[in-house]
């Protein structure tokens, strides 16, 4: 999934003319805090998101010679259609579990981080947690 999409996108980006910065493109993958704090019952999910996180640096190093940057965002608990399908009290409890701000993340906050990553040419090979300092318990 993520690796093959990145591979195909990188091939297309490498064929582009470079910008003044010598850059040809930016790949931003989505990992998850589960890559770092997987819970009981999440082994497969944590492993898949851990794979996304762990391929970020070597992919960035490999694609650097072509002017393609690779980054990943590891979001915490965000307001998504899936979460909004949960009962209100569950949504509130999930939001309250975030140290600060104590609420669900807003997809616009994810988008703002992605835009910053695109604009900041020095960002490369990083996985950025976007989770309000949340660390998931094993449960």
Predicted regions and their residues:
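Active-site loop immediately N-terminal to the catalytic Tyr-X3-Lys motif
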Residues: 37-43, 65-66
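Alpha-helical segment proximal to the catalytic Tyr-Lys
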Residues: 11, 61-62
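Short, small/polar-rich loop/turn modules that mediate ligand/substrate recognition or access, typified
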Residues: 64, 69, 123-126
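Catalytic Tyr-x(3-8)-Lys segment
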Residues: 89-109
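Short, flexible catalytic-loop segment of classical short-chain dehydrogenase/reductase
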Residues: 74-85
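C-terminal substrate-recognition "lid" of short-chain dehydrogenase/reductases
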Residues: 106-130, 135
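Residue(s) in the substrate-gating loop at a strand-loop-helix junction
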Residues: 32
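Active-site helix of classical SDR
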Residues: 6, 48, 56
């Amino acid at each position: 999934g993520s690796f093959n999409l990145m591979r195909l996108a990188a091939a297309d980006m490498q064929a582009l003319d470079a910008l003044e910065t010598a850059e040809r493109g930016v790949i931003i993958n989505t990992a998850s805090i589960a890559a770092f704090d997987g819970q009981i019952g999440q082994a497969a999910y944590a492993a898949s998101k851990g794979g996304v996180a762990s391929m970020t640096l070597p992919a960035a190093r490999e694609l650097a010679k072509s002017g393609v940057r690779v980054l990943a965002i590891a979001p915490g608990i965000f307001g998504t259609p899936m979460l909004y399908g949960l009962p209100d009290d569950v949504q509130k409890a999930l939001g309250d579990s975030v140290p600060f701000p104590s609420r669900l993340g807003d997809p616009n906050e994810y988008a703002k981080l992605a835009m910053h990553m695109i604009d900041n040419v020095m960002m490369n090979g990083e996985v950025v947690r976007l989770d309000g300092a949340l660390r998931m318990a094993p449960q």
